[in-house]
């Protein structure tokens, strides 16, 4: 938490009141007594969340504690459950080996009562109300301070449908009451069914505006079929189906304006996010440029998120009631074992389709035991394009020209067309050259001097000569990036997001650059912004090619 009084971040811990049977949040310096009964409290862990009756029923089945948890005070830490303050662990092997169909059948006959749950939650809110008031006050102040210089029309909320963005949105809407702030929902097309239901409920609220950002030019399964399923090391889905789509929507809504975006990012949620700052201005720390990113709940933990939601009776995503700790793409390679089990139980048709796809993929790349490869989650740690035909698209094949200095002959996997020549617009003006060899020349954007000669040799081979430049090697390196784009582009939208002038268009027909909008900044051809010139290099290069 961020302390207003001490103006610094303070570490909090979760304590347990044995008398009231609820968790209480405290810093090391605060008194270790329950504010309800005044009894001493005992340190439990660093963070917990409430376990709803639907999840309790599942835990009873998995832990062989039939009927023992419904009237208990049940909470969950990162891995461990706590029942009336005592730890209960469910081994990962139990989750992996669990029979989803048997569990589903048992859950059908369960009845859920919220009586004891509501009683425990009421005490949880009462025992922690002063803490909630403090963090809410601090968050509101932060939001007001950060938004002072921005117009209402230049402020947005990045909304995922998860608990963190739900709390962030509520804090922002309350702090900026009277203003209608746009909520941009990045629909990856892989959201949980209950997330879509939640978004539909929110659309009925006239006080907020939900804008859906979706990449309609691409299909997840078709792309996964070409470049393999996403993995922890190869999360191509994030940019293709979320960041790129959101960036495209933001460009339509805000143009080149510098905007303020409120995100539901928390420092303790992951190692990656722990390296972020609460307020980000530097482009290298943001997935989407031209915005100031602010995170009101940056110092909050999960305990505080749920305290805010339940105390303020905010509508939230029902997926959390089932046992999800995080709600995002239901088939995410970063999903926990419990999340995968929940998908098998509650989204069985979609899960079966995904499972069959993964098994087929394992067979195609030559895995000896494809079913086991999927069961143990080995696909989640795969890297590169081993076994995939598309891997050849990022393999640059060229040779030095023996008859022309500074010339190289490049082999292509896609035929030469008009869009191929447009890939050279970032280097300068593309004009017709010697018509007898179908040459195109690229004139330097400043001097007007020819710097590149493009000479098609056949449909799949081109000779490119660099002219009148000091560093021919650097220019050929950047040219090779455009060659790889031509061969490998899968419409991931990364290049669209890199271009600050909206000159790049990516659609079902491919990659195109508008010569009237391009400012020749060459960010789109630089490895600084796009490693290897195309994100597919990261996802499809094999170990041999990466050396």
Each predicted region: which residue ranges?
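C-terminal accessory/binding modules appended to enzymatic or scaffolding proteins
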Residues: 482, 489-500, 504-506
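Nucleotide-activated chemistry modules centered on ATP-dependent adenylation/adenylyltransferase
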Residues: 1-158, 163-483, 505-511, 516-519, ...
